[in-house]
Amino acid sequence: MTVMKFDLIKKEGKARRGKITFPRGDIQTPAFMPVGTYGAVKSLSPVELKEMGAEIILGNTFHLWLRPGTEIIKKHGSLHGFNGWDKPILTDSGGFQVFSLGKMRKLTEEGVTFKSPINSSKVFLSPEISMQVQRDLGSDIVMCFDECTPYPATEKEAKESMELSMRWAKRSKEAHGDNPSALFGIIQGGMYEHLRDESLAKLKEIDFDGFAIGGLSVGEPKEDMIRILDHTAHQMPEDKPRYLMGVGTPKDLVEAVYRGVDMFDCVMPSRNARNGHIFTSEGVIKIRNSKYKDDTSLLDPNCDCYTCKNFTKSYLHHLDKTKEILGSRLNTIHNLTFYQNLMKSIRKALDEGRFSEFRKEFLASYK
């Protein structure tokens, strides 16, 4: 029996306002989860994450398993004890990372054999191992082990990949056993609606605590992503959280909420911050651009983060040009605050019954 509880508070069209409850804390949905690949959101402390409103972060099973390894993390009690984050943590299963290794991996019914990106040693990962690693990490939300269907994929390739993921989903559920953490199933099927339907039906049969849409934002055109979202999101169980994996831009988040999604994660706000791409209420600023060299205005007048209250575009441009670590930190503080504030605005609009209006205004003003 899972310790997770999900309450659907309100709906506007397909958009949903909810709350996920864990012993470690509540998550107001729709929610964005900052990504802490190696147990840390790059350059930020848990205190800073809490200050910007994050209620859950994501950890990477694959990378934490390889380094530092679960034995070291278990000595701290859990990943929470290791990284000082005392709120909920979701861990992905490692399936996407194995998929991204490409030719370095060998896929069989049993699992995946691959060369470690750290020391090139041979490593084997299976649904059973992934479930054990996530149990050792003490994850609040565990993701079942799947193969992320590549793009492009023929219908035959997508079907074979999806069916393998469904067999692995069943094994993940069995291996999860009496672990009280929530276990989410992952819908695959590439860009084929009928395969997505088949995948969802099989996952419902196995019965998970939450459901995720995987295999999107892997290189497909935006219209294909929206088409699959349109077709799939509203068919997911009404009484369980719906998670869109690895997506996306601010517009993507608004559009996915409109279609009934509750949870998101993406490296985009933190990765883009390190490359000088800053999200603001009026669109993206490329702070590396020379036009900001003597721009004494603040970054975003509509943002109350530490960066926006204290530093000019000129200073942030200077930090970027000189490759100062502080520049990456300040940009990351802002970008992740922007994402958390966007989710707060979405939740407020849903609370007040004006999300449709909010969506129209946001899509019109955000460039």
UniProtKB/Swiss-Prot annotation:
Gene3D superfamilies: Queuine tRNA-ribosyltransferase-like
Organism encoding this protein: Francisella tularensis subsp. mediasiatica (strain FSC147)
Protein name: Queuine tRNA-ribosyltransferase
Residues that hold Zn(2+) according to the record: 303, 305, 308, 334
Entry's family note: Belongs to the queuine tRNA-ribosyltransferase family.
Start and end residues of each stretch annotated as RNA binding: 246-252
Assembly and oligomerization: Homodimer. Within each dimer, one monomer is responsible for RNA recognition and catalysis, while the other monomer binds to the replacement base PreQ1.
A UniProt-annotated Pfam family: TGT
